[in-house]
Amino acid sequence: MQARALLPATLATLATLAVSVLAREPPAAPCPARCDVSRCPSPRCPGGYVPDLCNCCLVCAASEGEPCGRPLDSPCGDSLECVRGVCRCRWTHTVCGTDGHTYADVCALQAASRRALQISGTPVRQLQKGACPSGLHQLTSPRYKFNFIADVVEKIAPAVVHIELFLRHPLFGRNVPLSSGSGFIMSEAGLIVTNAHVVSSSNTASGRQQLKVQLQNGDAYEATIQDIDKKSDIATILIHPNKKLPVLLLGHSADLRPGEFVVAIGSPFALQNTVTTGIVSTAQRDGKELGLRDSDMDYIQTDAIINYGNSGGPLVNLDGEVIGINTLKVAAGISFAIPSDRITRFLSEFQDKHVKDWKKRFIGIRMRTITPSLVEELKTANPDFPAVSSGIYVQEVVPNSPSQRGGIQDGDIIVKVNGRPLVDSSELQEAVLNESSLLLEVRRGNDDLLFSIMPEVVM
């Protein structure tokens, strides 16, 4: 009798499950033969990122407490596992973070770290298992009052990068390492300053040289050289991140005094974010004294340890300002850095040269940055104007220009260039200046369109 009573309930449950399965969305379209990353969205994911079903784009992972295990559910994020259809943390013990807070588990700490990266660029790391000791919150303790070096490192580390130069072997397709070093981020859009010898090589082997840049949070990008001066040993390289990056500011090396505390940070022997400290031994050491006969530079001498791989990394003062680029080690306790005033001059010359180049390259549009006030103004004139929060509004297309020939029209909204979201018109100008081909994602009415534009060089 009891088995007969359970049968209707079981059938009802199966029927409900069948309806649930049938009610799901139909399967997605088959994977493309070739991934077009310019079509990938740029999600902000509290639960982290995972590859999509086609292993082409990054999509949001399921966060703790979200459903999982069904065909259309996203995989669980980092340190999570699917337990009875719900994402749960693999570990249940409390942990102490570098921000001084106690977290219920590792997953809660990682979620806080992702939020912190988006806000300040500084991740939260695990200090220890268990709750934080009470001393972490006692900001008047000697540990917190006098650890000024740690304060500087915490401020500058997110903007220091590791750089590797490879040679792509033409026959075997393998990357042969040529050199490695460090650099620091100068602009939120991805401009990086380093040494010229870090990003160039005299190796005569055939093959294509490639630059790889790794950020503190583990993100890696391919980089291109923007400008290089081998005599002064300064170079700038460019990456194309999908979000704004933390930056360092240049100080005035002319104000340096012998005896000042300085901090050197870089990647000696590929050990990323290695910190050494010291003082300024001499603020102006003539390059000719170092045996550099053609030198016209006065170097900063410091006793901060600089090893192979530190080259290109920043030498900073206690305010976190860059006062030099770590360049040369002569002996233990005797190292040298290119002064920041020389870097400033190099960047100014680079900017002047590129402004001239900008006048020679154009795509032929008059544009305005999308702002809430501009959207309101355009919606007043055209109620069907799309609801957009960022991008570039095409006010006018120049006749017979690359944009007109490529299909751009008045009133279009350019939302991405080469897969990167556009927030300001200067970002499109920079792309016109630095990239030979532009893949523009355009919003026209309710349609999203792709156009390939080749900037024109005016002699």
From Swiss-Prot:
Keyword check for Secreted: yes
Active site location: 197 (charge relay system), 233 (charge relay system), 311 (charge relay system)
Tissue expression per record: Expressed in the ovary, essentially in granulosa cells in a follicle-stage specific manner. Highest levels found in large luteinizing granulosa cells.
Location in the cell: Secreted
Location, primary (coarse class): secreted
InterPro entries: Growth_fac_rcpt_cys_sf, IGFBP-like, Kazal_dom, Kazal_dom_sf, PDZ, PDZ_sf, Peptidase_S1_PA, Peptidase_S1C
Domain IGFBP N-terminal: 27-90
Transmembrane parts of this sequence: none
Record's GO cellular component terms: extracellular region
Signal sequence, renumbered to the chain: 1-23
Disulfide bonds: 31-54, 35-56, 40-57, 45-60, 68-82, 76-87, 89-107, 96-132
CDD domains per record: cpPDZ_HtrA-like (cd06785), KAZAL_FS (cd00104)
Spans annotated as Serine protease: 181-346
GO BP of this protein: negative regulation of BMP signaling pathway; negative regulation of transforming growth factor beta receptor signaling pathway; proteolysis
Origin: domain of life: Eukaryota
Enzyme Commission number, as recorded: 3.4.21.-
Pfam family, one: Trypsin_2
MF GO annotations: endopeptidase activity; identical protein binding; serine-type endopeptidase activity; serine-type peptidase activity
Protein family membership: Belongs to the peptidase S1C family.
Subunit comment: Homotrimer. Interacts with TGFB1; the interaction inhibits TGFB-mediated signaling. Interacts with BMP4; the interaction inhibits BMP4-mediated signaling. Interacts with TGFB2, GDF5 and MYH9.
Purpose: Serine protease that cleaves beta-casein/CSN2 as well as several extracellular matrix (ECM) proteoglycans such as decorin/DCN, biglycan/BGN and fibronectin/FN1. Inhibits signaling mediated by TGF-beta family proteins possibly indirectly by degradation of these ECM proteoglycans. May act as a tumor suppressor. Negatively regulates, in vitro, trophoblast invasion during placental development and may be involved in the development of the placenta in vivo. May also have a role in ovarian development, granulosa cell differentiation and luteinization.
Name this protein carries in UniProt: Serine protease HTRA3
Species in which this protein is naturally found: Rattus norvegicus (Rat)
